């Protein structure tokens, strides 16, 4: 069967039958051996000494910084890739961010990038850059499991559209990143829980936890995550990095394992706003294979990041800002607001639907569980025993949602969206928390069922994250300080539909006044 035939069978965005292939555990063993051989005896190239650049810390450089070095041929993609593989080998045994390291593939792609760049055929800012992706993006011939035992050893017959776009941009794939089971909240016991590099006792976010940890710890220069109720923004918050959830339909979901098709978004996770804009521009755009894909032109955000922000408006709702948030975080976000005003942005008072937080959460659970149950119809309940405790219970709850209940939830969603979108229409960004602060969590707690994990959900302050998934509007999460204990604080900029440029310009302008992006965990 050729690739086109396989694509037809995969048009449900990912939940096809698991294919036979090499086991994930065997692949990890084989690839680790390749990594050790590729990275032995790694030494710093002389250009770093000449330019007073610290090669030992290049893993914490931004994507944009190393992209400049690649473009000027002051470093090669192979050197960068070998350095990243060596760091993964040295550090990730404790952090568990990677589900699979694709060393051989990465080095082959890096060699190709070096040849093209040397020939004057540089494709753009991602060319030769080592990146990683959440393990729900189809990668042809490379295991993709989505944190699901039921998809163990699944070898996708084609690449997700986002992977095709990354490859076309010349990116180098370091590997696939760990995540919660099925992109929900709990983990299957056969999978490792990624460890927050700021503190092993701290929540690492869900569900793109591996993406957040790897990006924060300098184990890739950018990663992809998915967001259904906050799953890009919460790990970005927890790990002190930048996370961007684009407008629904801006980035194709084709070839991405679904959680809930009307809520799922794919977006970049990086160490700077400029980097997020670069990855967004590479992966966004119309895709005929995704019926929800938008035909709107993708803006060239990178060319306008440095622009004046005096024409931009920021919305603030003091009561919404404070709802459930600790005082330290509130103060940090107020400083963001003051800074944006001081450099030209106009403050506008808005009224966010904070009083509907319980209705919002209940409606989200109804819609998400119903759609998740439909997405897993091929394997649940027929293989229910292969699911982890939490996700099995979540799918069961979805099986009890009637079509009538789902339709009623859809009407409530549209009502809440009208309130939310009306306020967003007044501004370029609403400034608010992205989901609280990283909190302490007991080891292994996320292996439990719904009752055990419910307190975790509440601690994430879902009223800050769920509205943008409901409405499909873009948001940007970025660091805005640290607590006295050294825990990262983050702020969220929630924009109107297709408002990626505005939130990135505001985020970039704020970022230039601070040094949060230069502070990294001690790993």
Task: Please give the residue ranges for each predicted region.
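Structural helix-boundary/capping segments
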Residues: 90, 168, 172, 216-323, ...
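Short helix-loop capping/hinge segments that flank enzyme active sites or metal/cofactor-binding pockets
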Residues: 126-146, 303-317, 348, 366-421, ...
């Amino acid at each position: 069967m050729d690739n086109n035939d396989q694509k037809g069978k995969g048009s449900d965005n990912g939940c096809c039958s698991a294919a036979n292939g090499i086991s994930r555990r065997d692949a990890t063993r084989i690839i680790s051996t390749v990594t050790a051989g590729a990275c032995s005896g790694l030494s710093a190239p002389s250009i770093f000494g000449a330019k007073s650049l610290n090669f030992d810390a290049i893993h914490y450089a931004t994507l944009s910084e190393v992209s400049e070095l690649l473009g000027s041929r002051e470093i090669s993609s192979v050197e960068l890739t070998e350095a990243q593989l060596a760091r993964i080998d040295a550090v990730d045994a404790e952090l568990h961010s990677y589900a699979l390291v694709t060393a051989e593939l990465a080095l082959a792609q890096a060699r190709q990038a070096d040849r093209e760049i040397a020939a004057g055929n540089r494709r753009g800012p991602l060319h030769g850059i080592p990146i990683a992706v959440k393990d729900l993006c189809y990668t042809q011939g490379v295991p993709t499991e989505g944190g699901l035992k039921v998809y163990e050893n699944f070898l996708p017959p084609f690449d997700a559209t986002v992977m095709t776009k990354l490859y076309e941009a010349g990116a180098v794939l370091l590997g696939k990143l760990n995540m919660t089971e099925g992109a929900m909240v709990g983990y299957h016991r056969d999978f490792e829980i990624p460890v927050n590099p700021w503190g092993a006792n701290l929540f690492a976010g869900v569900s793109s936890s591996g993406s957040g940890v790897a990006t924060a710890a300098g184990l890739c220069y950018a990663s992809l995550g998915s967001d259904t109720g906050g799953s890009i923004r919460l790990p970005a918050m927890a790990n002190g990095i930048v996370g961007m959830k684009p407008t629904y339909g801006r980035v194709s979901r084709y070839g991405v394992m679904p959680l809930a098709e009307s809520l799922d978004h794919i977006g970049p996770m990086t160490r700077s706003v400029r980097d997020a804009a670069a990855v967004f521009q590479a992966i966004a755009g119309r895709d005929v294979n995704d019926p929800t894909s938008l035909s709107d032109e993708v803006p060239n955000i990178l060319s306008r990041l440095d622009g004046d922000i005096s024409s931009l408006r920021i919305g603030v709702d003091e009561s919404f800002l404070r709802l459930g948030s600790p005082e330290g975080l509130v103060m940090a976000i107020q400083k963001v607001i003051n800074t944006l005003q001081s450099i030209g942005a106009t403050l506008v008072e808005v009224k966010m639907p904070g009083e509907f937080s319980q209705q919002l959460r209940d409606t989200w659970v109804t819609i998400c569980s119903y759609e998740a149950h439909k997405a897993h119809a091929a394997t649940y309940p027929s293989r229910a025993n292969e699911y982890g405790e939490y996700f099995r219970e979540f799918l069961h709850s979805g099986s009890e949602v009637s079509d009538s209940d789902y339709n009623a939830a859809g009407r409530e969603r549209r009502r809440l969206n009208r309130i939310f979108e009306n306020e967003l229409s007044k501004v370029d960004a609403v400034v608010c928390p992205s989901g609280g602060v990283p909190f302490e969590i007991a080891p292994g707690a996320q292996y439990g069922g719904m009752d055990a994990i419910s307190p975790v959900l509440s601690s994430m302050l879902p009223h800050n994250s769920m509205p943008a998934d409901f409405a499909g509007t873009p948001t940007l999460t970025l660091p805005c300080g640290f607590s006295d204990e050294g825990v990262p604080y983050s702020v969220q900029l929630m924009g109107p539909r297709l408002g990626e440029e505005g939130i990135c310009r505001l985020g970039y302008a704020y970022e230039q006044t601070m040094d949060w992006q230069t502070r990294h965990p001690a790993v």
